[in-house]
Amino acid sequence: MAIEPASLDAPFAALAAFDWGGDAKTLAPIDAAVVAAHGDASLTAEVEKRLAAVLGSPAPRAAKQYACRKLSLIGTAASVPALAALLADKDLSHMARFALERYAAPEATTVLRTALGSVEGDLKIGMLSSLAAKRDTASVPAIAALVTGDSAVAVAAAEALGLIAGPEAAAALAAAQTGGAAAEAVVDARLACAEALVKAGRKADARSIYEALSKAVGDAPTTHRGRAVRMACQRGLFATMEG
């Protein structure tokens, strides 16, 4: 049975006032509409428009989080601006990112890149996580610039480059100037890049990373971590010789 737009008026009115502890059954018609929207462009556009409107309204945080979750399932480029407006909101940024990570529209990745340069602290770390989840190679230069010193952001940036992997990320990590936990994160990320390069058939590139890291820890490392890195390099070097 087709869902008529007018039948969504009451459920969306309930959503506009929905808060923690509210009756979730009143939102069931929206849940059903989201499911029915798959394969139905007209219904998708209608539901998406209404969900995006909730994000720009004075609705409670619970209602906006619900809207973000539903947009993560059916959202298109049309609702990217509404989600982008929440990326600097300390209470809703994580839910906006949750949705945008799942968008196929390139506009979603673009707004995450833009937000990376405008937010700080935990919100910046969140953007790094989302860009890594999307394996966004275009963000490598901006992320690489954050891999400096010894801070939580530097650690997160190194981890993001390790997840994005590829030769550009590997080169950025090799040039990183860090210390403490960030330096350890860089080593781990370089190992992740090398593993990804092996899987991509770029064994010579991977081998150069393993050799550099192995040389850095020496033939007889005295710490548990140093020994673990050397062992990982030895396994990696063996993998570059297979096939």
Show where each model-derived region lies.
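Structural detector for internal amphipathic alpha-helices that build alpha-solenoid repeat scaffolds
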Residues: 2-3, 20-42, 53-56, 62-76, ...
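Short N-terminal segments immediately surrounding and downstream of signal-peptide cleavage
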Residues: 4-17
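General marker for long, soluble alpha-helical cores
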Residues: 46-47
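Short, small-residue-enriched loops and turns at beta-alpha junctions
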Residues: 180
